[in-house]
């Protein structure tokens, strides 16, 4: 496919997507500008009434020398109407309303992860403010159950969150589901609380 150069502005009403095309089958795959390949569905146990749950995956094109893409994956979530658990270490989510993972990290979608940050954009209220990020092999965790019941790894130990706090964490293994985990002891509904989770990875350009 030939390259095209534009001298004026290029506009798109609904955004841009980067794709790859299989030379044999012709199958087109969106590689950048799309949501997580595996994210929470509309009826899942992690979307609160504020309905602010957005994921985005973008690949920054490599240079010809390294042939490696930087992959930036972002999750924005509002905790309003979600609940923390009754015990420290319980999964945050909707009360009795399905699995509560926020996304799945895969090598094909996020690349090899080498860094994660979690920024608090709005101070949590109603529920506890000590909220951590975990990964787990299983995508079956629900609200008010222990993250320790899953095959889990703590990614970010955030401590008490308030607007403007940002905490960095370690890498995330392939094919892991992500959960927000409360460290409080109440089972209260959140009335506020917004977080931005940013995952940085890399993969070899195809």
Residue locations for each model-derived region?
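Surface-exposed, low-hydrophobicity beta-strand/loop segments enriched in small/polar/acidic residues
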Residues: 2-206
């Amino acid at each position: 496919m030939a390259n095209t150069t534009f001298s004026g502005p290029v506009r798109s009403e609904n955004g841009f997507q980067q794709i790859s095309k299989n030379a044999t089958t012709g199958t087109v795959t969106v590689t950048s500008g799309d949501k997580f390949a595996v994210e929470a569905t509309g009826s899942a146990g992690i979307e609160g009434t504020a309905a602010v749950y957005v994921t985005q995956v973008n690949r920054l094109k490599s240079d010809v020398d390294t042939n490696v893409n930087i992959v930036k994956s972002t999750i924005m979530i509002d905790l309003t109407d979600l609940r923390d658990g009754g015990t420290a270490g319980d999964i945050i989510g909707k009360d009795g309303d399905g699995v509560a993972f926020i996304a799945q990290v895969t090598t094909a979608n996020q690349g090899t992860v080498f860094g994660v940050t979690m920024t608090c954009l709005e101070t949590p209220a109603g529920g506890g403010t000590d909220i951590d990020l975990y990964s787990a092999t299983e995508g079956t965790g629900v609200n008010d159950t222990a993250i320790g019941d899953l095959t889990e790894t703590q990614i970010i130990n955030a401590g008490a969150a308030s607007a403007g706090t940002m905490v960095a964490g370690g890498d995330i293994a392939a094919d892991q589901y992500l959960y927000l985990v409360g460290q409080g002891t109440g089972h209260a509904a959140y009335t506020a609380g917004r977080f931005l989770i940013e995952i940085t990875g890399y993969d070899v350009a195809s």
